[in-house]
A protein has these predicted regions:
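Auxiliary tRNA-acceptor-end handling modules of aminoacyl-tRNA synthetases
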Residues: 32-366, 375, 384, 388, ...
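Conserved catalytic/binding loops enriched for acidic/polar residues
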Residues: 517, 525-529, 554-945
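Short pre-active-site segment immediately N-terminal to the catalytic Zn-binding motif
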Residues: 366-370, 519-538
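The catalytic-center signature of Zn2+-dependent metalloproteases
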Residues: 398-418, 532-588
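Positively charged n-region of N-terminal signal peptides that target proteins for export
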Residues: 1-6
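Sec-exported extracytoplasmic/periplasmic mature domains
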Residues: 379-390, 543-544, 548, 584, ...
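Bacterial N-terminal signal peptides
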Residues: 8-24
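Bacterial Sec-dependent signal peptides at the C-terminal "C-region" and cleavage site
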Residues: 19-32, 39-40
């Protein structure tokens, strides 16, 4: 029994040690710890006959045993027990276990503490965080936006960078490290089911960073350095900037803020390159700085009930894949709309105020004169919520000048007014990625959109013109764009807002100013235009924060006459929805002029809010489907037509699903706008230039007018080879076919317009003296933009627009659709064919070959003008590619092009041998054209089809 006390003591020591370990999951059992406990339990230095032995002697004994270099003592037994007065404290001190971490105070010395959702400490370039037990293994939603870009897509200030895939993070402890984990929330199954267990095996989370614990706080929180997380290419911007890499030594913190429910971080991230790739919008491509903003907040758990989406109504989506769904289902995707958790204060009432309204705060930085149109634009949405059963669903409040809170605090939905110099607006919202519930939202306006004369429209490149007109217009071009684009950026419009409306509205303001100045209208009229435009922008961005997507078909609701009838538009706006990109509505002089922009939300907006926010009975999202289907079944009504971003690309067929168009007849609209532009040319210099001023405003106004002419003509060209697209389902009232070929008569009407306004010199016959007044700005310093040519590049810019429209007409995709259309229309019905199209274009573009039969011409008065020669070269090049089979157009189109070139050569050769005395320019041009055609025809015969 003599060993029983030792055995009991040993068990107690081991139990005590295990208890200590339970408080430190990262602790490691060391050999010296085990030895110390065993020594205490078995009494190696103290016999079991002396249970009250001095415990302070043991470390000294241990230390002395471990100190082999200590000098021998004359009284070994006594010294071993007590030691002298000086050596004993030192022995005690050296015997203490070495601290696992440096002292908290030492690690955070000279740092600045930032309280908030996560306690931060900023220490020079370092950012440290305290992560307590309540912050580990919790879900945080992370929004990434470009706070300041480089002026090139997609790195534009204001753009959300999540591309529909906002991250959910967790901090997890793993030994002596804290792992930053991105959770996989896309896949789901019924809780507790075998399928859920299979999912856990099949899909894993991603560990992004492993951060060493630097120290422990007095409260037991782990202190880690977050600098490696954010001072990195975390957003993968380098993937869209080939040749650039993140340069940590050139990157800095732009802003660090903490709030009760969120953390806001902004990094001035610099990307370095060898300088071999030139970027026009930055001064030196060896160092490109992008301000990246990170917003981190906890993902709350609420009683919110998700609502299922319908493809006839335009909401942003939260998409999950549910493996518990029946295998008989078409797919396993579950699509929820994004919306606020709006609940009636009185659920039994047909109309009720909400328990908690959606409150927007106007930031104190908004200029006083603009607060009313912005307030009115936000509150305009209450009309739609009344249809859904709510009074005063939205409130607007003004942030006081002495408000103790900042706009970045997610407890406040703010309408912000900033000066980033980028002319953008966005309505970013924080959305629960598993339910679609909107948790908070902000609207950010950049004040530079009012500085519309800063835009240098005359410097448009072919790429810039392509962006103005929808991007790639051929499938090969589109596929190349997609291949170059990182996968995380593709196909994200349905889940995250990417809005460029304000930059376009800035151009519309510039157009309005140019036209009104040329008409000598009062400044009050321009003020009216500005205030209406500002209100429409506010309505548009608020719509995004409510969950609504773009609707680019909305502008086709009215005829030109009806959209200028204010008795109608005061109730509905000038289109069916404010979620379109609407141009300024300016009509030719002598015609009725209506509102310049929509002054209220439209019928589509009311219907969409009804779908998303009407309280419906049912304990689950699926139980609501019958009532939701009744609402969505109205989609066939004219004012409820819907087409969004993926319907408005350059490759898409619907001519009415485009940006900045207006009216139900794009040919009539283009003719009206061509007249507006033509009326403005003569007086543009005098109207835009005052005595003592330079001529740069006149130059910019000219570029603005020319751009409007090109845009509306391109829009009208989409009738050729176009299709009317409908989202209606089978059985919907007034449902249309999903796809209908544009009537041949309308396609030919479009070609008539283009022959008159694009493939003709007349619209571009400006007075020579006008060109000589179009001088560029002479300032050359940071913040200014120096154009490549101080003189106006007239031939170059006119040809850019002509070639853009021509490229669309004879793109392989347009030709394929026209060719397919012959099968989609009864043979007894009229149809435009590819043979007719190419024959018309050849005759129109080379009309001089037939019309110039006699006469004498000079280089100053040529038979074929310089603008026409440029157009003819562009057409010949594209027809040559087509005839040689170098495009993906149908084989029939290639043979038609071959035959058309053969006939053109015959006509050219006949003219060259005729009586007309051609000028040197025209003769050389035709001789070269004939020779080139010969080469193409010979090559075609050698290579074959």
């Amino acid at each position: 029994m003599r060993f029983l006390p030792r055995f009991v003591t040993l068990l107690f020591a081991l139990a005590l040690f295990g208890h200590v370990l339970s408080f430190d999951s990262g602790g490691a059992l060391r050999a010296e710890d085990i030895g110390e406990l065993l020594q205490a339990a078995t009494g190696d230095a103290v016999s079991d006959a002396k249970p009250e032995a001095n415990h302070d002697e043991k470390p000294v004994t241990k230390e002395k045993k471990s100190d082999k270099s200590a000098p021998a003592s004359n009284g070994a037994g006594k010294d071993a027990g007590t030691g002298d007065a000086e050596s004993q404290p030192a022995a005690k001190e050296s015997a203490k276990p070495k601290p696992k971490y440096p002292p908290y105070a030492d690690v955070l010395k000279d740092s600045t503490k930032i309280d908030g959702l996560i306690t931060l400490h900023r220490k020079g370039d370092l950012l440290l965080a305290e992560l307590g037990s309540g912050q580990l293994n919790r879900d945080y939603i992370v929004l990434i936006t470009i706070a300041r870009g480089i002026g090139q897509t997609p790195i534009l200030g204001g753009w959300s960078w999540g591309f529909g895939d906002d991250a959910v993070w967790q901090f997890r402890r793993a030994g002596e490290n804290i792992q930053l984990v991105r959770r996989n929330v896309r896949f789901t199954a019924d809780p507790g089911s075998p399928t859920e267990k299979a999912l856990k095996v099949s899909y894993t989370d991603s560990v992004l960073f492993s951060l060493p614990i630097r120290t422990m706080s007095p409260s037991g929180a782990c202190v880690v350095d977050l600098t490696p997380v954010f001072m990195s290419d975390l957003p993968q911007i380098s993937l869209v900037m080939p040749g650039f890499t993140f340069a940590g030594n050139k990157s800095t913190w732009a802003d660090v803020n903490g709030f009760a429910k969120n953390v806001e971080l902004q990094v001035a991230a610099t990307y370095a390159s060898s300088g071999g790739r030139e970027i026009d919008s930055v001064p030196d491509s060896r160092g490109v700085t992008v301000n990246v903003h990170y917003s981190i907040s906890e993902l709350p758990r609420t009683s919110y009930k998700p609502r299922l989406a319908d493809d006839r109504v335009g909401y942003f989506l939260t998409v999950l894949k549910d493996f518990s769904k029946n295998e008989s289902d078409d797919d396993r995707f579950v699509r929820y709309i994004t919306r606020w958790n709006l609940e009636k204060a009185d659920p039994s009432a047909a109309m009720s105020t909400p328990k908690e309204p959606i409150i927007f705060w106007l930031e104190k930085t908004i200029p006083f004169k603009y607060r009313k149109p912005i307030r009115d634009g936000i509150l305009a949405w209450n009309k739609a919520f009344e249809k859904a059963g709510y009074y005063d669903a939205i409130e607007v409040r003004q942030q006081p000048d002495d408000a103790p809170w900042e706009p970045g605090d997610i407890r406040y939905n703010t309408y912000r007014w900033i000066t980033a110099g980028v002319a953008f607006a966005m309505g970013p919202s924080r959305v629960n990625p598993t339910t679609g519930q909107i948790l908070d939202a902000d609207i950010i306006f950049d004040a530079d959109f009012l500085q519309y004369w800063k835009q240098e429209y005359e410097t448009f490149t072919p790429q810039g013109i392509a962006l103005l007109t929808g991007g790639a217009i051929d499938l090969d071009e589109y596929r190349d764009e997609m291949r170059r684009m990182p996968e995380f950026m593709r196909d994200s419009h349905s889940t995250r807002c990417s809005c460029n409306m304000l930059g376009g509205v800035s151009r519309e303001f510039a157009l309005g100013a140019a036209v009104m100045a040329s008409r000598t209208r009062s400044s009050a009229e321009m003020e009216k235009l500005t205030m209406q435009g500002l209100k429409e922008c506010a309505m548009h961005e608020v719509g995004h924060t409510l969950g609504l997507r773009h609707n680019f078909k909305a502008s086709s609701l009215y005829s030109l006459a009806d959209l200028n009838d204010t008795k109608k538009t005061v109730e509905t706006g000038i289109g069916a929805s404010v979620m379109d990109y609407a141009p300024v509505n300016i009509m030719p002089e002598g015609t009725t002029q209506g509102d310049y922009f929509s002054t209220t939300i439209g019928p589509y907006d009311v219907w969409a809010i009804e779908y998303g926010y009407t309280p419906l009975k049912g304990g689950s999202p699926e139980a609501e489907l019958p009532e939701l289907a009744k609402i969505a079944a109205r989609s066939g009504e004219r004012e409820l037509a819907y087409g969004t971003d993926e319907d408005a690309r350059g490759i898409d067929p619907d001519p009415h699903s485009v940006r900045f168009d207006l009216s139900d007849d794009l040919v009539a609209y283009a003719r009206a706008q061509a007249k507006v532009v033509a009326e403005s040319w003569p007086g543009v210099v005098a109207a835009m230039t005052k005595d003592g001023e330079g001529y740069q405003r006149a130059r910019r106004a000219f570029g603005t007018l020319l751009a409007r002419h090109g845009q509306v003509m391109f829009g009208a060209s989409k009738y050729v080879g176009g299709l009317n697209v409908s989202r209606s389902h089978k059985g919907d009232a007034d449902a249309k076919l999903p796809l209908e070929v544009i009537p041949a008569e309308k396609q030919r009407e479009s070609l008539d317009l283009l022959e008159e306004q694009v493939f003709n010199d007349e619209p571009f016959n400006f007075p020579p003296d006008l060109y000589n007044h179009l001088a560029a700005s002479r300032w050359d310093h940071w913040g200014s933009e120096v154009v490549e040519r101080g003189d106006y590049p007239a031939h170059e810019i006119i040809l850019m627009w002509q070639d853009r429209i021509l490229s669309r007409l004879i793109s392989s995709l347009t030709l394929t659709r026209i060719h397919d259309g012959e099968l989609k229309i009864d043979a007894n019905e009229d149809a435009l064919t590819t043979a007719e199209l190419l024959e018309r274009l050849t005759k129109a573009i080379y009309s001089e070959v037939d019309t110039v039969k006699s006469g004498e011409f000079t280089n100053r008065k040529p038979a074929i003008s310089s603008l026409r020669r440029n157009l003819q070269r562009a057409y010949l090049q594209r027809m040559s590619y087509l005839a040689l089979g170098q495009t993906s157009a149908p084989a029939d189109c290639q043979t038609v092009a071959f035959a058309e070139l053969g006939r053109l050569k015959t006509r050219i050769d006949t003219q060259l041998a005729g009586e007309a005395k051609l000028d040197g320019y025209s003769r050389a041009h035709l001789e070269e054209t004939s020779a080139r055609i010969t080469k193409v025809l010979d090559a075609r015969m050698m290579v074959g089809p």
